[in-house]
């Protein structure tokens, strides 16, 4: 064999070994257990499309922050419900509000359906609260 052929074969072998080593390291097989877990965690948050992002929900329902938000929402719904009961004396909405113990979202849905029976200042109050809390228009 010629020396140029030997050098060429050695060069190809070195490139192949280098490629295999790089592939093993990037797959995590050459790393320890901690490195593999870190690699898995770093790749688990990457989603290619919006559909994949929607399938994996980002909410963690067991956290303290989520529970605090739920309690605050229930408390504000109760306060809002009491304020509406004081405004609406003896009409159909007052009876509906007394029957239900709803969340803030359910309360807004109820009011959106039955807003016609309230006095004018109550309608304005509902609209301003809805716009500031939800960013929408009734």
Curated annotation (Swiss-Prot):
What is the annotated localization of this protein? Secreted; Host nucleus
Cellular component GO terms held in the UniProt record: extracellular region; host cell nucleus
Q: Where is this motif: RxLR-dEER?
A: 38-53
Q: Which UniProt keywords apply?
A: Glycoprotein, Host nucleus, Secreted, Signal, Virulence
Provide the transmembrane region boundaries: none
Residues folding into a coiled coil are none
The protein's recorded glycosylation sites are 101
Its chief place of residence is secreted
Q: What is known of its domains?
A: The RxLR-dEER motif acts to carry the protein into the host cell cytoplasm through binding to cell surface phosphatidylinositol-3-phosphate.
The task this protein performs is described as:
Secreted effector that completely suppresses the host cell death induced by cell death-inducing proteins.
Q: Which family does it belong to?
A: Belongs to the RxLR effector family.
- Protein's recorded name: Secreted RxLR effector protein 51
Please report the organism this UniProt entry assigns to the protein: Plasmopara viticola (Downy mildew of grapevine)
């Amino acid at each position: 064999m010629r020396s140029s052929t030997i050098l060429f074969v050695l060069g190809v072998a070195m490139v192949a070994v280098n490629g295999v080593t790089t592939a093993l390291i990037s797959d995590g097989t050459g790393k320890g257990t901690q490195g593999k877990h870190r690699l898995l965690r770093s790749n688990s948050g990457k989603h290619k499309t919006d559909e994949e992002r929607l399938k994996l929900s980002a909410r963690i329902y067991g956290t303290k922050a989520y529970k605090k938000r739920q309690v605050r929402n229930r408390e504000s719904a109760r306060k809002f419900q009491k304020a509406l009961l004081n405004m609406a004396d003896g009409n159909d909405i007052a009876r509906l509000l007394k029957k239900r113990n709803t969340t803030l979202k359910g309360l807004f849905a109820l009011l959106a359906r039955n807003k016609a029976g309230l006095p004018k200042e109550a309608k304005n109050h509902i609209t301003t609260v809805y716009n500031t809390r939800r960013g929408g228009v009734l």
